[in-house]
Amino acid sequence: METLDIKIALDPVNDRAVLKETKLKRKDEGALIIATNGESRIVDAYEAQEIMDKLNDIGHGEYMGDSDYIAMMNGDKIINIGTGKCFIGSVIIMKFDGRALSMLAGDEFEKAAAEFKSRLITLVCDGQEFSALELL
């Protein structure tokens, strides 16, 4: 997004208008980044788009139950276990209405996090326990 910086001081030599590129973001809107270890953060639309661009060729999406929330992750990092597939790491969660992705807002961050956490399973390897997202 560009903004216009106008400086007028009744000085015909130095008065000017300059286009400046800025990144404005809404505090109440964004995408949720959440990891299987419980850590999370909210990213703005610009960072969400950068992540989605990087996931373009390697991404895998999973709906979070019957909700409109979809978790997108690096599909190359999905692992097979005896009973199915799972993912360990972080995902980006946005809404999908069947046509387009959109940002989360308000209490949707908590709802999306709860949906994500409800799909975590505990795996054990060499005596070490860790959480993983169970995939359908």
Feature locations, PLM:
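Short beta-rich binding modules
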Residues: 1-136
